[in-house]
A protein has these predicted regions:
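Short, structured segments at the rim of ligand-binding sites
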Residues: 1-421
Length: 421
C-alpha cells in the first residue's frame, strides 16, 4: 500500500509498543556472516522492508533463516558466497555492512558501492580506509569494491568521523583479525553496544568503554550465540512526537529511556510535560510548544534520524526555532512538503529556520525518504483536513505497521494503493 491518508486534528491517546531497532538489527544480522557452521539467534527483530532486504542478501550468500514471530535464527554453513548481489546493495546502503564480516571470514569479497540517497552522498571511504589499514587489498572498478585479505591484522585505527557503519564494519572485521584492534573516534550510538554484545556472545573480547574507543581482540573462530535487538529509539521518539504535535497523551512502551535523553531534554526546554518510567515514557497534553534551537549530531547528541520529525513538530511552536543538521549534507528536502501544508520553514545552508504557525492544512505530499515520510505523518496528524502521503514505501523501510499503531492511538488513518501512473 503506497498511499497513506490521514485526517488530522485528533489528540492521540493511548499506549504504543516500540519495535526492535532497525539500525541495531541490520548490523547484528550481518554479523552472522562471521560464523562457520554455526547459528545466531536474535530476539525482537522488527518486521521491516529493510530487514527483509538484509534477509534476501544473507540468503543470496548462503545463510538459511527461520522466523518465529520476532525471533530469527540464522544458520550459516561452512562455505558461503563472498559476492554481494548488486541489486540488493543498490537497494539498501546497509548491505555494505557485509563487507567487514565477509572479508574477515572468506578472505575476499566483491561488493558494489552503495548508492547515494535523498539525504546526501553516502560514501564508505572510512570503511575501506580502516580495512586497508588492517591489511586488506582493495580496488574499486566500475563502482564495485574488490577486497582481498589472507589475514586481517589488528592495529590502532582512527576514524576521521564517528561513522556508525564504519565502526560496525571494522568491529566485525576485527573479530577475526590477528591480535588487538583499537578503533578511536568511533560512533557511540546504542546500536554499537548491541553489536558489541553479539560479538562478545560469539566469544570475542570487546571493550567499548562507551567513550568512542573500541578495543577488540580477534579470535580464530567465532561461536554461535543468542542476543536481543534493542528497542528502536527513533521509532519510539517518533511516537512521542506524535503525542506532542497532536496535544495528546501517549505512552511509548518497551524503550530504554536513556537512549532518548537528547529528545527529552529538548522537549522539556519546549515546555512539554512527560513522565519517564523504567521502560516507558508518557507525554501529557501541551497547548503550544515554545521554540528551541537544536543541532543534529552523532550520539549522544540530538539524532539526525529524528531531525525531520522534530522540525515538523516545531512548525507549530510559538516562535522561531533553529535546527542545524551536522551529519548529512541534504537532510532538509522534506521542508518544501511541510511548507505546502502551511509551515513556514526557510533553509539557510545547514540550518532550518522554522517560524511557528498557528495551524497546518492537509495537502497531497510525497515521502522522499524514511524519516521525511515520518515527518509528514506527524504534520498530517496535526493538520486540519485530510493529507495524502505518497511513496509510503520509504516509511515501511523503518516503521513497522505504523498505520495500525496510529489507529490504536485514535488517529484517522487509511491506506490505499497508488493509482496506476
Ligand atoms: C547509520 O547510517 C544509520 N543507518 C542512519 O540511519 C543514520 O542516519 C546514520 O547512521 C547516522 O546516525 C543504519 O544504521 C542502517 P554514518 P550510516 O556512516 O552508517 C559520512 C535511518 O534513517 N560518511 O554514520 O550510513 C556520511 O556520508 C538511517 O534509519 C563518510 O563520509 O551513517 C554521512 O554524511 C538514515 N564516509 C555521515 O558520515 C564513510 O565512510 C554519517 O554517516 C561513512 C560515512
Amino acid at each position: 500500500m503506497d498511499v497513506m491518508r490521514i485526517r488530522g486534528g485528533t489528540p492521540l491517546k493511548g499506549v504504543v509498543k516500540t519495535q526492535g531497532a532497525k539500525n541495531a538489527a541490520l548490523p547484528v544480522m550481518a554479523s552472522c556472516l562471521l560464523l562457520k557452521g554455526r547459528t545466531l539467534t536474535l530476539e525482537n527483530v522488527p518486521d521491516l522492508h529493510d530487514v527483509s532486504t538484509m534477509l534476501d542478501l544473507l540468503a543470496c550468500l548462503g545463510v538459511t533463516m527461520e522466523r518465529l514471530g520476532n525471533r530469527m535464527t540464522f544458520s550459516v554453513p561452512e562455505e558461503i558466497s563472498w559476492e554481494a548481489p548488486e541489486h540488493l546493495v543498490r537497494k539498501m546502503r546497509a548491505s555494505s555492512l557485509a563487507l567487514g564480516p565477509l572479508l574477515a571470514r572468506c578472505g575476499k569479497t566483491v561488493l558494489p558501492l552503495p548508492g547515494g540517497c535523498s539525504i546526501g552522498s553516502r560514501p564508505i571511504d572510512l570503511h575501506l580506509k580502516g580495512l586497508m589499514q588492517m591489511g586488506a587489498k582493495i580496488e574499486i572498478r566500475n563502482g564495485i569494491v574488490y577486497a582481498q585479505a589472507d589475514q586481517l591484522r589488528g592495529r590502532r585505527i582512527y576514524l576521521d568521523f564517528p561513522s556508525v557503519g564504519a565502526t560496525e564494519n571494522l568491529m566485525m572485521a576485527a573479530a577475526l583479525a590477528k591480535g588487538e584492534t583499537i578503533i578511536e573516534n568511533t560512533a557511540r550510538e546504542p546500536e554499537i553496544e548491541n553489536l558489541a554484545s553479539v560479538l562478545r556472545g560469539m566469544g570475542v573480547t570487546v571493550d567499548t568503554e562507551g567513550t568512542g574507543c573500541v578495543r577488540i581482540k580477534g579470535v580464530e573462530e567465532v561461536q554461535g550465540c543468542r542476543e536481543r535487538v534493542i528497542p528502536d529509539r527513533i521509532e519510539a521518539s517518533t511516537y512521542v512526537l506524535a503525542g506532542v504535535i497532536t496535544g495528546g497523551e501517549v505512552t511509548v512502551d518497551d524503550i530504554v529511556p536513556a537512549h532518548m535523553d537528547a529528545l527529552l531534554a529538548k522537549l522539556e526546554e519546549a515546555g512539554v510535560r512527560f513522565h519517564v518510567g523504567s521502560s516507558s515514557v508518557t507525554v501529557f497534553p501541551v497547548r503550544r510548544l515554545m521554540p528551541v534551537s537544536i543541532r543534529a549530531m552523532p550520539y549522544p547528541g540530538f539524532p539526525t534520524d529524528l531531525q525531520p520529525q522534530m522540525v515538523a513538530t516545531l512548525t507549530l511552536a510559538n516562535g522561531v526555532s533553529l535546527v542545524e543538521e551536522s551529519v548529512f549534507q541534504a537532510r532538509f528536502l522534506y521542508s518544501e512538503e511541510l511548507n505546502r501544508m502551511g509551515a513556514n520553514i526557510t533553509i539557510k545552508g545547514d540550518t532550518a529556520i522554522i517560524q511557528g504557525v498557528e495551524r497546518l492544512q492537509g495537502a497531497s505530499v510525497r515521502a522522499m525518504d524514511l524519516r521525511a515520510g515520518a515527518a509528514l505523518i506527524l504534520a498530517a496528524l496535526a493538520a486540519e483536513g485530510e493529507t495524502r502521503i505518497d511513496e509510503m514505501v520509504h516509511v515501511w523501510r523503518g516503521y513497522e505497521a505504523s498505520d495500525k499503531k496510529l489507529k490504536a492511538l485514535g488517529a484517522d488513518v487509511a491506506l490505499e494503493e497508488a493509482e496506476e501512473k
